[in-house]
């Protein structure tokens, strides 16, 4: 075990931050360290916290961390939300709440959006989760904003997803729920002291009852919270625990771990295979002809891709 | 030229809708038709309209269509936004405004979110744009929500991106601009009759002046609009025209077309190569051993992927 990997296994947060930065930059040295850490991963309970901007995810997260710490659990946070407190975009109150946690050795918070590059977020996020997992954090929360490809990919890689919404968000944001509805294991109606909170709960319940899917055994709870003063946070943590227990008892906890590793592996194969295929092509006249025909629209991209892939052979 | 492709080239909207549905379902028949259409693409001016939910993109879009039609341009719309009017999540006023357009032969609007599947949106979106391009629409607008991998990929594939924001959106949404700032060619401050509009314009101008990038020749304009009654829409369409002219004069219009085709081709190669690699592996004992070691964490996903990719050979 090399020095950096050892430090990270011992919980050294500076070493972990250095490694995550290497991984963000796709540095081979980072991958080498992550390989050494890998056998020590697979123990964390991984949560997703998602919802549109402005619903109070950051404030809720600050209180969630407090409650997890009360229960003697170490908490890691990977914030994929560009508006998360770490990146400086949040309200002063959240920054103060978070500062309390940053002085706690049992809490480690990393934002994946500070470097300004948005591409490849889901890959780097998964790598950061592996690092925090190896460090021994019991609970890892991935905070994402909105709904899109990133969120769906992140949801596929966590054990439990909580979707946060608000009363009175207006038609446009209500419509987003159609996408978020599919990925939620737990639903949170925040700012539940505002008018219309019970209406949102009723609407969600109705939509959830109509939701079709193979996983009919788990009935997603809808938790009302007032994040600003911590109301409902204990109930929310209880709901996370209940879902974890459900996953363990049904064997789905291990299934999701296996599926996550397999998908990550498959994604790596895709990227490495593409690099290998394209790296060796530039000097070949046949490839240059193909690209010329593509650019001049003499050949369509599907036919061009089929031509190239036809020449690929794979043995193991 | 087969029947379906011919109908689409003649502008038949029902045939186009059928084809886009086939492409959403990844049906080989859809790809065959798209191949036939491909030589007829590459003529449209492709715009991206993006911003957080609630900023009034749909209302703005309805007025934009009217103004483009005034200028005798045929307009296609691909709405990647789940809250777009087509999917039924929008305000009644927008639906009425859109209905007027749906009865106009020179307008074609497709939503990519009605089917409820969120994965692979950016690929299907590009395919839908190709279909509309082949149909002869002069302007194609891609409407997306929020900021994420999808938006960045969409921004990479359009000629001109307009980013819409609002006065007084609060800290959290302001922070999102950091991501949106990078991809905007034109910025729109909608609801500019609300207090604080000039402050947002000033902030944006300041942030844009600090924006670093190779493309220093184009100074992104900031347009104030009141979408609900169409104020500023003429100026916005003028800004789109000015950016188009800038792209054409500097050769960037063709460059972006070429880059878009190349990236689409590269993406297809990645997907087809992965399918080819994995399709033939399941029966191989060596592969099954590799997966067993992966699942039991005896081998890490990087090493497993390297092992597999090592055996790939590519000739053309």
Describe these PLM feature segments:
Chain A
Residues 60:
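Hydrophobic positions on the alpha1 helix immediately C-terminal to the Walker A/P-loop
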Residues 156-174, 185, 189-198:
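Conserved Switch II/interswitch segment of TRAFAC-class P-loop GTPases
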Residues 2-5, 112, 187-189, 221-226, ...:
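Short hinge/gating elements
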Residues 186, 192-249:
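Canonical P-loop GTPase G-domain recognition
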Residues 224, 235-312:
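Long, well-ordered amphipathic alpha-helical subdomains in the mid-to-C-terminal portions
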Residues 52:
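P-loop (Walker A) phosphate-binding loop of NTP-binding proteins
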């Amino acid at each position: 075990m090399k020095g950096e990997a050892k430090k990270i296994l011992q919980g050294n947060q500076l070493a972990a931050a250095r490694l995550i930065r290497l991984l963000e930059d796709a540095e081979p040295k980072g991958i080498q360290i992550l390989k050494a850490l890998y056998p020590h991963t697979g123990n964390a309970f991984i949560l997703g916290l998602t919802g549109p901007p402005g619903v109070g995810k950051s404030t809720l997260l600050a209180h969630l961390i407090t409650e997890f710490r009360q229960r003697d659990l170490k908490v890691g946070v990977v914030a994929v939300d560009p508006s998360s407190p770490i990146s400086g975009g949040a309200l002063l109150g959240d920054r103060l709440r978070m500062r309390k946690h940053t002085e706690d050795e049992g809490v480690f918070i990393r934002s994946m959006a500070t470097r300004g590059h948005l591409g490849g977020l889901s890959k780097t996020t998964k790598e950061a989760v592996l690092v925090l997992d190896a460090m021994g954090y019991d609970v890892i929360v991935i905070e994402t904003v909105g709904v899109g490809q990133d969120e769906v990919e992140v949801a596929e890689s966590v054990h439990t997803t909580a979707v946060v919404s608000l009363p009175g968000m207006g038609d446009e944001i209500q419509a987003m729920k159609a996408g978020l509805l599919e990925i939620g294991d737990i639903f949170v109606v925040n700012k539940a002291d505002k008018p219309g909170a019970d209406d949102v709960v009723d609407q969600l319940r109705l939509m959830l009852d109509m939701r079709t899917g193979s996983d009919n055994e788990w009935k997603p709870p809808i938790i009302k919270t007032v994040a600003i003063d911590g109301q409902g946070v204990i109930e929310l943590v209880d709901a996370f625990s209940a879902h974890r227990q459900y996953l363990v008892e049904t064997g789905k906890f291990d299934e999701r771990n296996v599926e996550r590793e397999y998908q990550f592996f498959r994604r790596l194969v895709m990227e490495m295979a593409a690099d290998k295929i394209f790296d060796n092509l530039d000097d070949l006249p046949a490839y240059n002809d193909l690209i010329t025909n593509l650019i001049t629209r003499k050949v369509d991209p599907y036919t061009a891709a089929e031509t190239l892939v036809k020449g690929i052979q794979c043995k193991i």
